[in-house]
A protein has these predicted regions:
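Formylglycine-dependent sulfatase
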Residues: 1-385, 394-428
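Residues forming the ATP-binding cleft of Hanks-type serine/threonine protein kinase domains
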Residues: 391
Length: 428
């Protein structure tokens, strides 16, 4: 139950860095950046005596702040022979950060980024100082370009299709009719071949799904291999026992569920983030729990492990004690607040919305307005609601909002939704 607060990359990354929702850190959409003057947990780590570094995907437009060392992709970066911008190369440069001349590294970006992370630990890490390193891969971002050595992986395998891949969206909110993130919206760059003609919607979905998933999983294989390289380095250099290792992403992703790819909406495939943490000194291997965690909790949790107090500007909470003994601190949340701001984005035609998620229910309000945020576009929309009951409908295909049996559930969830919206000081 680890949930993203805004399921799109730059806003989620800003939330992870700051422990704040988008309306507090200023990164509402992909067109916003995290100002170097803004507080973030890397700065707190530095104040606490930690050496800090970030390598790979940054994607927050401005120069990374709070890092003693960085070597990052400009913007989204590229898969093959990526360019990385280092702190040294940025010195004295006044152009927009992503336009900074960087260095070309030969190879696939996943391999390059892992190698640079290992190299930093070998060459730059101060053995007399604790460290915090962020290693951020580009993969498996669209358009899923994998390293050549994985080209035959799953070649003759048919990937099982999700049960709801042919969702008809009956009874659902109107956004399902507007979105252009269905498998049939994939283009030749995504598929890396000419698209077949004269296929029905479902026939195209079946064809596209197999190509999409194999490319995606080949990208994942590269990540798996390179995470292994990093873990091996930590083991071989006596660092594993006393290092907190966090494996996560900036959001979830639709892998054919509802016939979709991408993210942005509140169904579990998009809302839920992978989160695995290894810390042999304190976390029991193989342990799991169902506590509701949000990505705003990452920063205060990491500070907690570093022995640094949570600053007042952070909206998340440390979940260290949950990892240690499985017990939630008194007053731990029983619901999470979500908000997606990028209305009418030109590639996916998604609708702005906010909502609440509990262990059983999701209530979502699609308000459908730009609110003058960067990267939004006017797209007429009549506001509507969805209610999912994940106990009765775990695949989130039925909208129970207008079902009379759920009137009290809706009323209670609306009250809780607006309580959370107010508590987080989201006033728009």
């Amino acid at each position: 139950n680890c949930c993203v607060t805004n399921s799109i990359s730059a806003p989620s990354r800003a939330c992870i860095m700051t422990g704040q929702y988008s309306h507090k850190n200023g990164v509402y959409t992909l067109d916003d950046g995290l100002l170097p003057t803004h507080d973030n947990f890397a700065k707190e780590m530095q104040k606490g005596g930690y050496q800090t570094a970030i390598i790979g995907k940054w994607h927050l437009k401005y120069e990374p702040a709070g890092f003693d060392y960085y070597n990052v992709l400009p913007g989204q970066g590229r898969y093959k022979n990526p360019v990385l911008i280092s702190k040294e190369e940025r010195k004295g440069n006044t152009c927009p950060f992503d336009k900074t001349p960087g260095k070309i590294y030969q190879g696939h970006s996943t391999d390059v980024i892992a190698s640079q992370a290992i190299n930093w630990m070998k060459e730059h890490k101060d053995d007399n100082q604790p460290f915090m390193l962020m290693c951020h891969f580009k993969a498996p971002h669209r358009s899923w370009e994998y390293a050549e050595r994985f080209s035959d992986l799953l070649k003759d395998v048919e990937i099982p299709e999700p049960e709801n891949m042919f969702d008809t969206y009956e009874g659902r909110a109107y956004y399902t009719k507007l979105q252009t993130m269905s498998l049939e919206d994939m283009n030749e760059k995504d598929m890396k071949c000419e698209l077949p003609a004269n296929l029905s919607r479902d026939e195209f979905r079946k064809w596209a799904y197999q190509r999409y998933m194999k490319d995606y999983l080949r990208c994942i294989a590269g990540i798996d291999e390179n995470v292994g390289r990093i873990l091996k380095f930590l083991d071989e250099n006596g660092l594993a026992q006393n290092t907190v290792i966090v494996y996560t992403s900036d959001q979830g992703f639709y892998l054919g569920e509802h016939g979709w790819f991408d993210k942005r909406y509140m169904q579990k495939e998009s809302l839920n983030m992978p989160l695995l943490i290894r810390y042999p000194n304190e976390i029991k291997p193989g342990s799991t729990n169902k506590s509701i965690i949000i990505n705003a909790d990452f920063a205060p949790t990491l500070l907690d492990y570093a022995g640094i107090s949570k600053p007042s500007y952070m909206q998340g909470e440390s979940f260290r004690s949950i990892l240690k003994n499985g017990k939630e601190p008194k007053g731990w949340r029983d619901a999470m607040y979500y908000r997606y701001w990028m209305h009418g984005d030109q590639h996916h035609h998604t609708v702005a919305h906010y909502g609440i998620c509990t262990e059983r229910y999701k209530l979502i309000y699609y308000y459908g307005k730009t609110l003058n945020k960067k990267g939004t576009h006017e797209m007429p929309y009549t506001p509507d609601w969805e209610l999912f009951d994940m106990k009765r409908d775990p695949q989130e295909m039925r909208n129970f909002y207008n079902d009379k049996r759920y009137r009290k559930v809706v009323a209670d969830l609306k009250e809780k939704l607006y309580q959370l919206k107010s508590a987080y000081q989201d006033n728009e």
